[in-house]
UniProtKB/Swiss-Prot annotation:
Keywords: Capsid protein, Virion. It is found in: Virion. Belongs to the P2-like viruses major capsid protein family. This is Major capsid protein. GO terms for cellular component: viral capsid. The keyword Phosphoprotein does not apply. It comes from Haemophilus phage HP1 (strain HP1c1) (Bacteriophage HP1). InterPro entries: Phage_P2_GpN.
Length: 336
């Protein structure tokens, strides 16, 4: 391992977080102050275009009321007897954070490759680690099912409960597990399917939102890659497109609009999932005072260990502003 580069990285980390260099070199973890924790969270958020569009917030406690939760009704009006006021909707669940520990070991050989860049070493190494954390945040956000004491699932589904799971538990009426036509499944595509196409599905999900949200112009249709691929193939087959025309269709934004909403396939979104909400209705909360960092050289494992510990959780701010389908119950045209 390039020791000079390692010392330079440790020195940069110590300086950035105002920590004693000898403590960092010993591999001791250290707590971040709230502004430092917020800056780290912002840096991670910048690694993903999708994360940039949702809320990533530092909070003071591990449990509490949602910061951007729903009101009981619209907030505007008038009263002859006093001021017009709307209350927070206390029927909606609050938030609860869980211990979250992100760690990665960078083999000495890989670190030496980073060291070649010298003046950009700290920047590139930080980007490498933060990119991994950002991808994991999205993986858990879409696929998280539980909070295990000791996590074992390769898909990270036992690290925390993500947005889809929270919607299922906290507003079951907005989480479709079967259609009215069939039992135990949701069929998509084809004349006899519950939904002939994605436009029908998107419109139906939109109609499931609380009435006051249905005509918002910031709604988005989140849709999995398998559903988009199937829709594309059906369009190509229906119109008998030539290879050149298919290529043109592929370059055209098929994801433009469904049900009158812009469509997005977020990173790590389940392939057969679909949901309607606004991006600002999705949040990741981190307890500011819980954040800890560490960097150490592990001789036994022949690599550098970087760790980022915090209390973290996911929040659907307004449950009435989100609907979704259970992707495990989806059957495509021709499947039994």
């Amino acid at each position: 391992m390039n020791k000079q580069a390692y010392y330079a990285l440790a020195a940069a980390l110590a300086k950035h977080f105002n920590q004693p260099l000898d403590s960092v070199l010993r591999g001791e973890s250290f707590a971040l102050k709230a502004p430092e924790a917020a800056l780290l969270g912002e840096n991670i958020q910048q690694r993903s275009d999708f994360l940039k569009q949702i809320n990533m917030i530092q909070v003071a406690h591990t449990k509490g009321q949602k910061l951007f939760g729903a009101t009981e009704k619209g907030v505007t009006g008038r009263k002859q007897t006093g001021r017009n006021l709307a209350n927070l909707d206390h029927t909606q669940n609050g938030f609860e954070l869980a211990e979250t520990d992100s760690g990665i070991i960078v083999p000495w050989a890989l670190f030496d490759s980073f060291a070649i860049f010298k003046d950009r070493l700290v920047e590139l190494y930080s980007e490498y680690f933060q990119n991994q954390v950002a991808l994991d945040i999205l993986q858990i956000g879409w696929n998280g099912q539980s909070v295990a004491d000791n996590t074992t699932k390769a898909d990270l589904s036992d690290v925390n409960k993500g947005w889809l799971k929270l919607l299922q538990e906290q507003r079951a009426a907005n989480f479709m597990t079967e259609s009215t036509k069939s039992s135990g499944k949701i069929t998509i595509f084809g004349d006899n399917a519950d939904y002939a196409n994605l436009d029908d599905l998107a419109f139906d999900l939109k109609q499931g939102l609380d009435f006051r949200h249905q005509n918002r112009n910031d709604l988005v249709f989140l849709v999995g890659a398998d559903l988009v691929s199937k829709e594309t193939k059906l369009i190509q087959q229906k119109h008998g497109l030539t290879p050149t025309e298919k290529a043109a269709l592929g370059s055209h934004n098929l994801m433009g609009s469904f049900g009158g909403m812009n469509a997005i396939t977020p990173p790590n979104f389940p392939a057969r999932a679909a949901a309607v909400t606004t991006l600002k209705n999705l949040s990741v909360y981190t307890e500011a005072e819980s954040v800890r960092r560490s960097l150490r050289n592990d001789e036994d494992k022949k690599g550098l260990v970087t760790s980022y510990y915090r209390q973290e959780g996911y929040v659907v701010e307004d449950l009435g502003l989100m609907t979704a389908i259970d992707h495990t119950k989806v059957k495509l045209n021709g499947e039994v």
